[in-house]
């Protein structure tokens, strides 16, 4: 009996242990459920501490190909593909100067603006060979939903620039009307227009447009070199001007009349007064090269450089530089992009020799005519004398009568 009681108690204890082990997993499962509830509130708390509009706005780089620039000699033309920026407020797109706004030039995909060189906060920089103009399109983004005062979008800025060569070589080329320089365009690279003209008078009103121009020796040649741009501060200096008997810029036979921005001092016919301007004018007497044939051609060339007026270190600001001053200058020589503009040539006639030949010819003709007239007059005089004597002699001839006397052989009676 005791044995049965012991077995019953053992079985009862085992059953109680199984019941406790069965309920403990439920308790363990409820603990992770409680713990997962805690982190769910953490993201909501972190979103309440997002950055506000007090954070300084920064510029965002534009997507590739969203902005394109055309560099002309008069302005910069900027095109913005606003289809790639659907959050821009197109009514509030300006340049750096907020007063320079897009002038309604807008279509379904692009907005474009004409950008001047010398206003709207356009900046410029120079190096030895080029002038670069820089500005930016500044665009406001649309206000946040439900607010007309704040935005959590950054202000967008699209910087752009145009680079232009500073130097060129202008020439006159045989039997061709004048043309303007056109530089080959590359990305963000523009061109200035350089011209060289010769005018008919010192008023510089009417340029020659047909060549060759025929001149006599020492006739004045009124010449002008010019750079054209809408940048009102762009100026020009002729660094060197020279003449050759051929269109070859490097002809071994040449005559230099402007060097280092200085007119040739020993040429009394040259008049050149430099001042910072986009137009430079000078006058020089027509000449010929010794050893060349009569009515030979003369070709003129000028090496010019463009600068921004007010740049104290620019070559234009230095003006005429003697060789000594030039050696002291720290400014490097800028070769630039060389091009040719056509204008000529000039045919120079030998006025002095032609005049002498005409004088000799006139004297010869006069002598010949005088000689012929003299001979004619002489013959006429002789003929008149003979005729006079012939018709005069019967009436005026003296009759001679001899009479004899006693003492004389004869006596002449008249």
UniProtKB/Swiss-Prot annotation:
Residues 18-364 are extracellular. It is found in: Membrane. Residues 386-414 are cytoplasmic. Disulfide bonds join 241-302. Residues 39-57 have a biased composition (Low complexity). It is a single-pass membrane protein. GO terms for cellular component: membrane. Residues 1-17 form the signal peptide. The chain crosses the membrane at residues 365-385. Component of the acid-insoluble and acid-soluble organic matrix of the aragonitic skeleton (at protein level). Residues 18-65 are annotated as: Disordered. Gene3D superfamilies: Zona pellucida, ZP-C domain, Zona pellucida, ZP-N domain. Keywords: Disulfide bond, Membrane, Signal, Transmembrane, Transmembrane helix. Residues 70-323 form the ZP domain. The keyword Transmembrane helix applies. InterPro entries: ZP-C, ZP-C_dom, ZP-N, ZP_dom. This is ZP domain-containing protein.
């Amino acid at each position: 009996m005791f044995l049965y009681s012991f077995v019953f108690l053992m079985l009862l204890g085992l059953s109680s242990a199984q019941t406790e082990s069965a309920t403990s997993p439920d308790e363990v499962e409820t603990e992770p459920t409680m713990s997962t509830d805690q982190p769910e509130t953490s993201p909501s708390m972190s979103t309440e501490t997002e950055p506000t509009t007090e954070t300084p706005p920064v510029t965002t780089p534009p997507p590739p190909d969203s902005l394109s620039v055309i560099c002309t000699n008069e302005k910069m033309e900027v095109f913005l593909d606003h289809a790639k920026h659907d959050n821009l407020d197109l009514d509030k797109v300006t340049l750096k100067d907020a007063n320079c706004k897009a002038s309604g030039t807008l279509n379904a995909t692009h907005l474009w603006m004409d950008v001047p060189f010398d206003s709207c906060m356009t900046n410029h920089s120079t190096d030895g060979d080029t002038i670069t103009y820089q500005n930016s399109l500044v665009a406001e983004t649309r206000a946040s939903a439900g607010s007309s005062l704040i935005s959590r979008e950054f202000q967008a800025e699209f910087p752009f620039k145009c680079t232009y060569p500073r130097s060129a070589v202008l020439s006159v080329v045989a039997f061709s009307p004048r043309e303007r320089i056109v530089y080959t365009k590359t990305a963000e690279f523009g061109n200035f227009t350089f011209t060289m003209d010769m005018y008919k008078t010192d008023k510089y009103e009417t340029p020659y447009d047909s060549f060759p121009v025929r001149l006599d020796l020492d006739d004045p040649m009124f010449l002008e070199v010019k750079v054209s741009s809408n940048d009102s501060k762009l100026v020009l200096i002729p660094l060197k001007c020279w003449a050759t008997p051929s269109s070859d810029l490097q002809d071994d036979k040449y005559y230099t009349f402007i060097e280092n921005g200085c007119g040739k001092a020993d040429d009394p016919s040259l008049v050149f007064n430099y001042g910072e301007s986009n137009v430079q004018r000078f006058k020089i007497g027509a000449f010929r090269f010794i050893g060349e044939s009569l009515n030979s051609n003369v070709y003129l060339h000028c090496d010019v450089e463009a600068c921004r007026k007010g740049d104290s270190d620019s070559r234009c600001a230095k003006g005429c530089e003697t060789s000594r001053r030039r050696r002291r200058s720290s400014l490097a020589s800028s070769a630039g992009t060389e091009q040719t503009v056509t204008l000529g040539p000039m045919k120079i006639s030998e006025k002095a020799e032609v005049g002498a030949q005409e004088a000799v010819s006139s004297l010869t003709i006069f002598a010949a005519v005088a000689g012929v007239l003299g001979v004619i007059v002489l013959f006429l005089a002789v003929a008149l004398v003979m005729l006079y004597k012939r018709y005069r002699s019967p009436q005026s001839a003296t009759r001679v009568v001899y009479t004899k006397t006693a003492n004389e052989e004869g006596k002449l009676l008249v």
